[in-house]
């Protein structure tokens, strides 16, 4: 019976491609945009096999090239426990794929002259002016800046990225903290923790984008979710992207498997229908594959989509350029070799070096719950993959291999 339900879900999912996305972006047959239908089918085959093996509950993958969607597949289950098939309009917890959204919102304020990248963060959040560095509580040599927040060189960290005393003083993540702390309480806790290193001297993945989200609120005078809707979601017709899933969309939320496929440990994600105490810009948004594909296509189009301009072309160029230079990438630089860091995204430096397929100049960022996207200006390609699983890092190089091998001209 269990086997029959899996097969039924897979059949229904395979009938669903394009239903929710066809009206969102123009579509094309793969061969019309230099892709092979036969080779793209390998994506479906691999994901279907992983669903059958109990590795993932399901997935939605979108591949667009030359501005047209050539592949959309919804595979497996939206909720395996309930036996609900995956659909293209499933809503996923984005985790860190929230960060590029908030970075773009901040850059829209930068374009208006309302904040500058070199501004000290304390100009907007005075509580962060008196921070010290390390267990020695050394004074800062210079304050963290807006640019530091966008490129993760602020000196902040995540509490779950280490076991030393400094890490223990930080919140584990904003996904957890925003359920119990207000934004003021969150900032106060950060202000009392020493920085892990001097600002501008090392890359460290961190709560920086949550702080950036607060800066956006202060400068705009609006809650972060409201400002994101005003500057990004409504202009781009991202109708399902938000911080709080409304009651009438609850059934569309994708659910993970109840246990970790490798360890058997319980695996639970937050309920995106439960209100938070603040809009956390580092990882609390939800979206669909179709919505996020529109956002990624806007960036690939250098700031514009269907007549709506979100950013200027030079600002997108600034965002997707190297902002690390000779800054140390530390021991936890999981963007990996061959990639530098721009503003809110990781940017590929060369065709080689990285142990996965790609093109110099492509840019990406994933989410901890197995969401992933990238844009490739040279190949004129946007790819969005949505799952809810603890195995996200496995699928980053795998999806790149499966998608890019389908390019035939």
Regions found by a protein language model. Give the residues of each.
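Bacterial N-terminal signal peptides that target proteins for export
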Residues: 1-8
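Bacterial N-terminal signal peptides
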Residues: 9-18
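Boundary at the C-terminal end of the N-terminal hydrophobic targeting segment
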Residues: 20-22
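Short, surface-exposed loop or secondary-structure junction motifs
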Residues: 26, 132-359
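Short, conserved catalytic-motif segment at the N-terminal edge
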Residues: 26-94, 116, 130-136, 268-270, ...
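Short, conserved phosphate/pyrophosphate- and ester-handling motifs at nucleotide-, phospho-/glycolipid
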Residues: 36, 99, 288
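Active-site SXXK
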Residues: 41-48, 61, 67-69, 92-121, ...
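Short, well-ordered beta-strand elements
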Residues: 373-374, 379-389
């Amino acid at each position: 019976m269990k086997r029959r339900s899996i097969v039924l879900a897979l059949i229904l999912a395979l009938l669903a491609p394009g239903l929710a996305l066809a009206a969102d972006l123009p579509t094309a047959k793969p061969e019309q945009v230099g892709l092979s239908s036969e080779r793209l089918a390998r994506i479906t085959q691999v994901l279907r096999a992983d669903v059958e093996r109990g590795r993932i509950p399901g997935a939605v993958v979108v591949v667009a090239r030359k501005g047209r969607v050539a592949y959309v597949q919804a595979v497996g289950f939206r909720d395996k426990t309930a036996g609900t098939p995956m659909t293209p309009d499933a809503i996923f917890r984005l985790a860190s794929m929230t960060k590029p959204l908030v970075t773009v919102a901040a850059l829209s304020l930068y374009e208006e002259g309302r904040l500058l990248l070199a501004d000290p963060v304390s100009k907007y959040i005075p509580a962060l002016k008196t921070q010290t560095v390390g267990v020695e509580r050394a004074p800062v040599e210079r304050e963290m800046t807006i640019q530091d927040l966008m490129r993760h060189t602020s000196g902040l960290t995540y509490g779950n990225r280490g076991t030393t005393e400094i890490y223990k003083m930080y919140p584990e993540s904003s996904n957890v903290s925003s359920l119990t702390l207000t934004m003021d309480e969150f900032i106060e806790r950060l202000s009392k923790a020493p920085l892990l290193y001097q600002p501008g001297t090392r890359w460290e993945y961190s709560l920086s984008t949550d702080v950036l989200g607060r800066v956006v609120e202060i400068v705009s005078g609006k809650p972060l979710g409201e400002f994101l809707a005003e500057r990004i979601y409504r202009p781009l017709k991202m109708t399902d992207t938000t911080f709080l899933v409304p009651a009438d969309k609850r059934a569309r939320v994708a659910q993970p498997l109840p246990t970790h496929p490798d360890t058997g440990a319980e695996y639970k994600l937050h309920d995106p229908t439960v209100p938070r105490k603040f809009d956390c810009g580092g990882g609390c948004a939800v979206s669909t594959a179709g919505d996020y594909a529109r956002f990624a296509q806007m960036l690939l189009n250098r700031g514009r989509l269907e007549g709506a301009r979100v950013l200027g072309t030079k600002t997108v160029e600034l965002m997707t350029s190297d902002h690390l230079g000779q800054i140390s990438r530390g021991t936890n630089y999981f963007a990996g070799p061959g990639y530098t860091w721009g503003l809110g995204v990781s940017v590929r430096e060369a065709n080689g070096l990285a142990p996965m397929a790609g093109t110099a100049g492509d840019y990406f960022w994933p989410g901890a719950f197995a969401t992933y996207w990238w844009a490739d200006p040279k190949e004129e390609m946007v790819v969005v993959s949505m799952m809810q699983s603890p195995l996200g890092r496995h699928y980053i190089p795998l999806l790149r291999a499966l998608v890019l091998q389908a390019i035939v001209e």
